[in-house]
UniProtKB/Swiss-Prot annotation:
Active site (UniProt): 492, 495, 660
Record's protein name: Alpha-glucosidase
Keyword Secreted tagged: no
UniProt catalytic activity: Hydrolysis of terminal, non-reducing (1->4)-linked alpha-D-glucose residues with release of alpha-D-glucose
Length: 985
């Protein structure tokens, strides 16, 4: 949940149709706000800046800066170093030019290359301007046996007309990164380098943002963590300076020569191959990446050039190389986290949670976790329950009941902490007192406390650079858990957000607790009237009423505004202006001011580092502190954290949700590309606020979205205060649709869990783009409307209203690939390179199983605990040559270091299916049945370990070519995988 100012100011990509709202009365914490001091709206208004890319007066650094000349080149077995000296008079265009730089080219491993350019001279006073601490973001290390000859890369360089370099793939001679024809600009507040790209390039990543899967040419990509309700094509919560570049080649001639091709010109009959590589810039400063015709322009507000290249040559290999060497492998999630999660802003007391739980049970909808938004807090304060509505005594009773039923509860924890009113002796807050005693809060440049504003009023911020901050945070988590046995942490608002510019609480603490500088949803002037696109067609009367209400509210809120003149900052040699840097990135907040809705760039950490240099790391460091704090709550239990603000490497501690989206078809559409982005970034535990957060949802959108999200790793429904309720049991059709999709999700939970184990141990992905799984088909390069779960399950959702069919592609069908419909279990009749029209009436989501796959499955239950107690089954989908394979991983589902594990390999060929297990985890549930798809002839007999099975247990459908073998429990009474077995037909 984000600052509502961003929601109120936002506009949507698609046309909005309004409808009537059913208001929920805000919680007592919200209604009490009417008697509070309200922070003025003007407090969150910053300077009016013009983004450089939109500024007609902006100077093009490439045209005025001299670049550098390389000299004093020294070679070693692992690369070379050189001195780079300014090649002319300083341009000082957006800062002060650095005269002397040091270049280091290090061939770190066969598949990895690092190029670093840093100032030759710096000291403790300015090191953080350029050097990102390895304690914050580790640098990849060279392998012991790394050398130039064994590398997949070659680096060449030239001084004509100024220093430039190329990174070349040895295998193909393709130039992957090429700064020729451009100038390196390196200043204390501005770095720019340019690389050439092929025509119609295929780039993915560079987030966080909501956009198409494949990045668009002419896109302006800003990286700077921001608290903002999900806009399109703007920077939002996270910072991931990593991209995947895929290039397709036509293979032809006797020597199989490779010619690069555009994906739009691919022909189904032609043979292609692809090569992918990855590029990561280890830099935490604000950034802007401009994609232009056949080039990429990379600009930063400081730091250094610290580029790592990954040779791939497939997407899967690039992602593994990035994670294994650089950012770390994803956290292994608890098994239960793969169940369904229900949340909303507006559950006002424990009784409402009781009602929600009862309704899920009444309608027999699986439910694993209930989530609490800021409603549970005493005055919106972290680690402190409202004792009237969420008392610890009642909470203990409710959580005991919840836990006994195999379910769990997760509360939200925000990035800021309330600071008590010094003139009110009863305004006590022990968390603040303990933090103040250890002096662990961020300061102003003069050493005074930096005091911003968030939900509770005026607030302070943990300083993650302080040596005692993480222990302080861990102690608060432990102390709170001893009062209330929560089951994870939802870490929010850590971009880090503030509802005012500067240290606005300084001198104003007597006003605390203060109301935010905007109306909360449901308060006068902010009634939620918004509905999804198309609502006016299906609900005309209600839509007309809501439209009138929205118009009246808008008219009442209208006022005459004046625009402040644009502020332009002129660089002063030797001096940094961190509040208004001379180069203005296209930051999403009003006026592009870095101080708006965030703590100021000049706020200062205990080690002297200014927020300007590490802003986008705040959430990442808070996740780290939360992860290790939870390990003190539960010593050997995997911490469960879902966080909003992330950085490269956050996935080793937490999952992520897509933030404050909208109840719009557009938000649902972009949720797929959001999820696939985070697959690349090494954060596979990803989901979105299903049915939408901001605004009111409707039955059709929620029906489709509950089905789509059933195939995302993190599956949660969540919406905003005072919007209509949207739990899946609110509409009969949504109940049916939800249960239909959950029947599939819960059946394949063992497959999901196995995928997470593989991600955790190898760096593989859970959700996959078609182009990544089928790398030799250029026509798939931009497909972002369907996706794969692992290698075996493909989902083709409906993403628009009022339709009952959907268009989808079936990769590989022209090269022997077979796809089976999940529901009919028959092979799909599809042609290569063209869309297939698929029936998809409301309540049905098309799902397909890839030939060659074996899926281990269990039965559906209302909790994952109970689902894990059910018999096993296997779904074997034969390839065109009659083979299939799969695997299964099991453990206790929660231990950081499980003592007992089990791995099972499945292999089918020549009418034989084998299961081979290894490990010490005891799985007592028997095998109930095996279903084999694509069996072209009725078998004369079926045997298990040589024993002929009775004809009653064997069924064959000659039309669908499905073989079903049941009644296997008695043959596997000791457990489905207690011993190896062979099934023949």
């Amino acid at each position: 949940m984000a600052g509502l100012k961003s929601f109120l100011a936002s506009s949507w990509l698609l046309p909005v149709a309004c409808g009537a709202s059913q208001s929920i009365v805000p919680s007592t914490s919200a209604t009490a706000a009417y008697s509070q001091f309200t922070i003025p709206a003007s407090a969150d208004v910053g300077a009016n800046l013009v983004a450089n890319i939109d500024d007609p007066q902006a100077v093009n650094a490439q045209s005025v800066c001299p670049g550098y000349k390389a000299s004093d080149v020294k070679h070693s077995s692992q690369g070379f170093t050189a001195s780079l000296e300014l090649a002319g008079d300083p341009c000082n265009v957006y800062g002060t030019d650095v005269d002397s730089l040091t270049l280091t080219v290090e061939y770190q491993a066969k598949d990895r290359l690092n190029i670093q350019i840093v100032p030759t001279y710096f000291d403790a006073s300015n090191a953080s301007w350029y050097i990102l601490s390895e304690e914050l973001v580790p640098r990849p290390k060279a392998s012991q046996n790394a050398s130039v000859p064994q590398s997949d890369f070659v680096v060449s360089w030239s001084n004509e007309p100024s220093f430039n370099f190329k990174v070349i793939r040895k295998a193909t001679g393709d130039v992957l990164f090429n700064t020729k024809g451009s100038t390196l600009v390196y200043e204390n507040q501005f770095i720019e380098f340019v690389t050439l790209l092929p025509e119609e390039y295929n780039l993915y990543g560079l987030g966080e943002r909501m956009n198409q899967l494949r990045l668009l040419e002419n896109a302006n990509l800003t990286l700077y963590a921001a608290d903002i309700a999900d806009p399109i094509d703007d920077n939002i919560y996270g910072h991931h300076a990593f991209y995947l570049d895929t290039r397709y080649y036509k293979v032809g001639g006797q020597n199989k020569s490779h010619t690069i091709v555009k994906s739009s010109e691919a022909e189904p009959s032609q043979e292609y191959v692809s090569y992918s590589h990855g590029v990561f810039l280890r830099n935490a400063h604000g950034q802007e990446i401009l994609l232009r015709d056949q080039k990429l322009i990379w600009r930063t507000l400081g730091g250094s050039v610290d580029l790592t290249f990954y040779s791939g040559p497939t997407q899967a290999e690039v992602t593994k190389q990035y994670q294994l060497s650089t950012v770390g492998l994803p956290a292994m999630q608890q098994y239960n986290t793969l169940g369904f999660h229900q949340c909303r802003w507006g559950y006002n007391n424990w009784s409402e949670f009781e009602d929600v739980l009862a309704n899920f049970e009444r309608f027999e909808i699986p439910l694993e976790y209930l989530w609490a938004d800021i409603d549970y807090m005493h005055g919106y304060r972290n680690f402190d329950n409202d004792q009237h509505r969420f008392s610890y005594e009642e909470g203990e009773k409710f959580l005991n009941k919840l836990h006994a039923g195999g379910r769990r509860w997760v509360p939200i924890v925000d990035g800021a902490l309330y600071i008590p009113n010094p003139e009110n002796a009863s305004d006590a807050y022990e968390t603040y007192d303990r933090g103040a005693k250890d002096d662990v809060f961020i300061k102003n440049p003069d050493g005074s406390l930096y005091i911003g504003a968030v939900w509770p009023g005026y607030t302070v911020y943990p300083d993650w650079h302080h040596p005692k901050a993480s222990d302080f945070w861990a102690n608060e988590l432990v102390t709170w858990w001893n009062k209330l046995h929560y089951d994870g942490v939802w870490y929010d608002m850590a971009e880090v957000s503030s509802f005012c510019v500067g240290s606005c609480g300084t001198g104003n603490l007597s006003m605390n607790p203060a109301h935010p500088p905007f109306a909360l949803p449901g308060e006068p002037g902010n009634v939620v009237y918004d509905y999804p696109e198309g609502f006016n067609i299906t609900n005309a009367t209600e839509a007309a009423s809501a439209s009138a209400g929205a118009a009246s509210q808008s008219a009442a809120a209208s006022s005459t505004t004046t625009s402040a003149p644009y502020l332009r900052t002129t660089p002063t040699p030797g001096v940094r202006n961190v509040d208004h840097p001379p180069y203005v990135i296209n930051h999403v907040q009003p006026g592009h001011d870095l101080s708006v809705h965030a703590i100021s760039p000049n706020s200062t950490h205990s080690d002297g580092v200014q927020e300007y240099d590490v802003h986008s790391l705040y959430g990442h460091q808070g996740i780290n502190a939360t992860y290790h704090g939870l390990l003190k709550v539960w010593e050997n239990k995997r911490p469960f954290i879902i966080a909003r603000s992330t950085f490269s490497g956050s996935g080793k501690w937490a999952g992520h949700w897509g933030g404050d989206n909208f109840s719009k078809w557009g938000s649902m559409f972009f949720s797929i590309s959001q999820a696939l982005q985070f697959s690349l970034f090494g954060i596979p535990m990803f989901g979105v606020d299903t049915c939408g957060f901001n605004g009111n949802t409707d039955e059709e959108l929620c029906n489709r979205w509950m089905q789509l999200s059933a195939f995302f790793p993190f599956y949660r429904n969540h919406n905003v205060l005072s919007a209509i309720p949207q739990e899946p049991y609110r509409w009969a059709s949504v109940i049916d649709a939800t249960k239909a999709a959950m029947n599939i999700r819960y059946a394949i939970l063992p497959y999901f869990y196995t995928l997470f184990h593989l991600a955790h141990t190898t760096g593989s992905t859970v959700m996959r783009a078609l182009a990544w799984e089928f790398p030799n088909d250029p026509s798939l390069a931009a497909v972002g409307t369907q996706f794969l779960v692992g290698p075996s399950v493909m989902v083709i959702p409906v993403l628009e209203p009022q339709v009952d069919t959907v268009q989808g592609v079936f990769p590989g069908v022209g090269h022997g690939e077979v796809w089976y419909d999940w529901y009919s279990q028959t092979a799909v009749d599809a042609k290569p390179g063209v869309n297939t029209t698929i029936s998809a009436p409301l309540g049905h989501i098309p799902v397909f199983v890839r030939g060659g796959s074996i899926l281990p499955m269990q039965e559906v239950a209302l909790t994952t605990r109970d689902a894990r107690k059910t018999p096993w089954s296997l779904l074997a989908s034969l390839s065109s040559n009659g083979t299939a394979s799969g695997q299964l991983y099991l453990d206790d589902g929660e231990s950081v270091y499980p003592e007992d594990t089990l791995s099972v390999d499945f292999l089918a060929s020549r009418s034989t299916l084998r299961a081979s297990a290894r490990g010490t985890w005891k799985e007592a549930n028997p095998l109930a049945n095996v279903t084999v798809l694509g069996v072209t002839e009725k078998p004369s007999s079926v045997t298990l370990n040589g024993e002929t099975l009775s004809s009653d247990s064997v069924k064959y459908n000659a039309t669908s070519h499905v073989l079903h073998v049941g009644g296997l429990q008695k043959h596997t009474a000791d457990g489905a995988w207690a011993k190896d077995w062979v099934l023949k037909w």
